[in-house]
Amino acid sequence: MIHGIGTDIVHIARIRTSLERHGERFAERILAESEREAWRASRDPARFLAKRFAAKEAFGKALGTGVAVPATLHAVAVDHDALGKPLYRYGDGLQTYLDDRRLNAHLSLTDENDYVVAFAVIETR
């Protein structure tokens, strides 16, 4: 059964401006520790951050908490499976929260020119 859905759109230029203004400190506010190495190696750091931010916003909307405890920016990470499909990873507290409620999340990400869109679905297992 569907617990919730969430979507978010991010203008990459907005992220690029913040990144230029605040540097790595801005990225550290958005990224979980596990995402930071991939961000540093990214060919387009602003696009990378925009995707992560949109994915986390969509997750919070689908969960119904917004980007707040337990679904903070650092508690939610975006990764990819062996085929490149995006997926969520969680900090211990959020993983426990989801397990206790038997919730499972799915993520779709797309980007085109100036925008990134994320769509999240959370279902009951």
From Swiss-Prot:
- Where is this chain's protein located in or outside the cell? Cytoplasm
One GO cellular-component annotation of the UniProt record comes to:
cytoplasm
Any single GO BP term: fatty acid biosynthetic process
The EC number(s) attached to this protein equal 2.7.8.7
The record, for SUPFAM superfamilies, names: 4'-phosphopantetheinyl transferase
Task: Give residues annotated as binding Mg(2+).
Answer: D8, E57
Q: Which domain of life is it from?
A: Bacteria
The record's GO molecular-function terms, alphabetically, read: holo-[acyl-carrier-protein] synthase activity; magnesium ion binding
Which reaction is recorded as catalysed by this protein? apo-[ACP] + CoA = holo-[ACP] + adenosine 3',5'-bisphosphate + H(+)
Assigned keywords, A-Z? Cytoplasm, Fatty acid biosynthesis, Fatty acid metabolism, Lipid biosynthesis, Lipid metabolism, Magnesium, Metal-binding, Transferase
Cofactor(s) recorded for this entry are:
Mg(2+)
**Enzyme class, first EC level, given as a word:** transferase
The keyword Cytoplasm appears for this protein: yes
Please list every transmembrane segment annotated in the UniProt record, as residue ranges.
none
Entries under InterPro entries matching the protein: 4-PPantetheinyl_Trfase_dom, 4-PPantetheinyl_Trfase_dom_sf, ACPS, Ppantetheine-prot_Trfase_dom
Q: Which family does it belong to?
A: Belongs to the P-Pant transferase superfamily. AcpS family.
Described by its record, this protein's role is as follows: Transfers the 4'-phosphopantetheine moiety from coenzyme A to a Ser of acyl-carrier-protein.
Q: What is this protein called?
A: Holo-[acyl-carrier-protein] synthase
Please tell me the species this chain comes from: Azoarcus sp. (strain BH72)
